[in-house]
Amino acid sequence: MLIIGLIILAAPVLSVYMDKAGTAMFFYSGKAHGDKDRKNRIVRCVLSMMIFGMISLTGYMNGCAMSKQERLAEELDGQQPGGIEGKVYEIRQSGDEWRVYVYAEWITFGRGDSEETVEYRGRSKVLLYMEDVGSLKTGMKLTLSCSLSRPDSADNPGEFDAREYYSHKGIYIVGKDISILECGEDYSRIGDILFRLRIKSGEITDSVFGETDGSVIKAMLLGDKSGIDRDTKKLFQMNGIAHILAISGVHIAIIGMTLFGVLRRLTGSYMASGIMAISVIVLYGVMTGMASSTVRAMIMMVISVIGQVKGRSPDMLTSAGTASVIQALIDPGIILDAGFQLSFAAVLGMAVPGALMKKLIPTKNKVVSTLVMNLAITLATGPLVIFYYYQFSLYSIFLNLLIVPLVSVIIFVSIVVIAAMLIFPGILQGNEMAVGIGAFPVKLILAIYRQLCEWAMKLPFYSINTGHVSVMMIVVFYMAMVGVLILLVRAKSADCARVRRRMVCLCAAVIMTLCCVCYEAASFDREFRVVFMDVGQGDGILIRSGMGVNILIDGGSSSSNKVGEYVMVPVLKFYGAAHVDYAFVTHGDKDHVSGIQYLLSDTNSGIRIDNLVVPMYGDIENMGELLELAEKRGVNIIYMDGGSQMSCGKDAAKVWLNFLHPSEKTDIKDANDLSAVIRLEYRGYSVLFTGDLGEDGERELISEGGDLSADVLKVGHHGSRYSTSGEFLRAVDPDLAIISAGENNRYGHPHGETLERLDACGADVMSTIDYGAICVEITDGGISVTGYR
């Protein structure tokens, strides 16, 4: 039965990759093997083959439809005016913005700058961003004009990729600047009732529990995470308990199975109570947005209820496998969704390692049993958490032991309070004492959650930043983990001492393999690299040595207010940089320091700075706020003078950083021309960083007589017309020039004259506008350059 369940669960994953080759590979075997009743085996096999054929055909057709939609989206070149005809299937509010999901039957838009238009007929999902939905309702047919584009893609490693995220949900096109031309009067009555119920429940939640706690309750009950404040979200994420914010099996079990039990006692009928409970759960799923974890839990609950109606007990693996097949049939792309994978990994954790560990540690103690199950779930989901989020909370196992049991209390009490406010609004609206008593248990538990997380964050190694790992490492880890558990179970049950010794030896070998995998994961992708992050209009450079030394040179943006949170932290975590050894600041402009200020101010970012390095004779006045913040955080401040140098690493892998400018002799007042100039040397290659240095600063630098030659030049002042002069380029003689600038910036960077000068000196030019983040790797074999886009 275990093998059958694993095959069922793995089949949809195979289907996604097989669809790309033109063949769907779904497989559902039910109970054709291992069933005690062998007489009907042939019938079950034939039925399984028929189901296999139908699922294969459906999977192939869905895969083809998704491919067509993806190819249609690729026709879009930036923002293009277009039109849509379709039907609204979901309306959701996110902060001050509304997101309207439409099944489009007809899409048209212009092709580039030409007058040619692209027209597509066929059902496809489109996401519309609107400031106000007015009288728009679920189920309405509409015709509209808008600006169409593809969702934004990630420009940096580790950054959130909206294009990939929405593609997993079958959405390849988004629309903005909406103008509704025609709107039908018919709409879904049930959909509208659920929409209004969701909005009203959210308002009640905010009024009863307060804005902060209410946002958490809305996430847990209504699937609305838009109101959760940044600090709460990070607190839960860093401690490995963010999963409680997603609607999953716990919620469905509490709502659905409790309702089923109550109705069964009231009606005395399994069938009637089952139908009513399933109907309520389906409506609840629709109201909360049908997230992948919600759908999985709903399907498994339906199977469980049907099993009880039929007098049979469902198998967890078979139920999970069936749920995965159904979800993959509806939307094959969801298999690659992180939420989908984590949801099923948790179920598998209970079914496979959980079952094996219970055999290893048989106990009637509920605390020990719960701890064992938490460990099993952590082992199952941990590798995926590392793969997607590049970090792991060491104490999450123990926190979940305390936190998860109380989730049911939060859900139950919250539902009772909200239901009471909906049913008896006149009685409870002004009764603050009654409402306060009802809300008290929830507010108390959430306060305990926060306090536990804050205590955990004060412990050493509370969060381990692993960096990105390969898929193969994840696969090997799972194989080794299951292998170790199976061997230990067999060794424990073996009667012969010799067999037990062999099992233990095999187990030791597998553990050694697992340790090697963990070591490889820890040292994965550790080549020396210089990453020019795409921060928009600004500068942000990460230097990561093979010895694990992390250096930042600037980090800020004038075009993105949250460059530290949304760009720098993800990039640092992607490369496993839990701390920055040295953060160099060339000068105090916002587009060079705003991200570093964020790292210094946000203690929950998971990144710390050890040393802040600033020019002794540079733009110190504009760095006042930055220096004050660094002192407050206990960061060591180093003042560097022109002509000084520092090194890190050993022997041939030593990295030299030469501080060339400004010095005590520098006679310039302009803040940009006082930018720190740093020359990096590694294995005979060099990179020159110039901040916002202009032509006057360049002449001053040349007159000081230092070695300016470099293989790679970070072009000064984002490619400004008044920077990177011909004289300076002759002194540097770069093979590669990298420009960091924002797309469609108001300064016109990089300027055409600057590009002409770079071309004349023979340097290859790469810009973050065109390539996104640019990674320069230096090895014994030379320099290699790759763009992230």
Briefly describe each language-model feature range:
Residues 350-461, 735-740:
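Alpha-helical transmembrane segments of multi-pass integral membrane proteins
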Residues 546-551, 556-614, 703-720, 733-738:
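Active-site metal-binding motif and surrounding structural segment of the metallo-beta-lactamase
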Residues 58-243, 565-570, 617, 624-647, ...:
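Membrane-interface helix/helix-cap signal primarily in integral membrane proteins
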Residues 3-22, 231-397, 413, 468-524, ...:
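Hydrophobic alpha-helical transmembrane segments in multi-pass membrane proteins
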Residues 1-74, 296:
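N-terminal leader/targeting segments
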Residues 328-336, 454-582, 631-709, 770-789:
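Core dinuclear metal-dependent hydrolase active-site scaffold
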Residues 168-298, 305, 379, 531, ...:
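Aromatic-rich juxtamembrane segments at the membrane interface
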Residues 611, 698-772:
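Cap/insert and terminal regions of metallo-dependent hydrolase folds
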